[in-house]
C-alpha cells in the first residue's frame, strides 16, 4: 500500500481510508470498481 499511496495519494487516499474503516472486503470490492474506472494500472499494482 505504500507504493500505491505514493503514486495515487489523491485517489488512493480516499479509497485506502474507506477500505481500512470498513475492512478488507471493501478494498477488494472497490478495487474491482476502481480498476474499471482508472485502468489496469491499479490492478497491476495490486
Swiss-Prot record:
Superkingdom classification of source: Bacteria
Pfam families (UniProt xref): LtuA
InterPro entries in the cross-refs: LtuA (IPR035380)
The protein's name in its UniProt record: Late transcription unit A protein
Organism: Chlamydia muridarum (strain MoPn / Nigg)
Top-level taxonomy: Bacteria, Pseudomonadati, Chlamydiota, Chlamydiia, Chlamydiales
